[in-house]
């Protein structure tokens, strides 16, 4: 192998390392913890679930894709990121799944308040009559 070939291989290796670091840096993830678990009662009032097994559970959200990793919401498929978040607009992702009934659908929604001061950003997760709240960090 001549010096020119070695140099080309070196440059290609260096480029691939730098590119992979750039990709990983852009793959930001939220780490979230559930602090409150509630549901909407039949009379429209909000009821906090006492001793909920969800409280204290953690999950992660891949910011670019909306994919959720963790037991709290692991069954959610095909997320759609509606807003990637900024100082003036929360990060928003939805999941839409067809229900068994005609023209029915299940819609789940996650909002993370990126504009909140400090490192912990409040979130709200809504699924039908279920509401979970907590905090996320990047």
Predicted segment positions?
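Contiguous, well-ordered beta-strand patches that form the walls/edges
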Residues: 64-107
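Short, solvent-exposed mixed-charge patches
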Residues: 137-138
């Amino acid at each position: 192998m001549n010096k020119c070939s070695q140099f080309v291989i070196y440059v290609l290796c260096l480029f691939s390392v730098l590119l992979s670091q750039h990709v990983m840096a852009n793959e930001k993830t939220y780490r979230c913890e559930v602090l409150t678990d509630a549901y909407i009662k039949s009379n429209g009032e909000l009821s906090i679930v006492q001793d909920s097994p969800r409280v204290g559970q953690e999950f992660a959200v891949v910011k670019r894709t909306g994919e959720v990793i963790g037991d709290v919401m692991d069954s959610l498929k095909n997320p759609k990121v509606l807003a990637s978040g900024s100082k003036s607009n929360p990060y928003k992702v939805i999941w839409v799944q067809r229900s068994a009934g005609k023209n029915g659908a299940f819609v789940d929604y996650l909002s993370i308040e990126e504009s909140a001061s400090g490192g912990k950003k409040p979130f709200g997760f809504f699924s039908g009559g279920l509401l979970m709240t907590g905090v996320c960090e990047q």
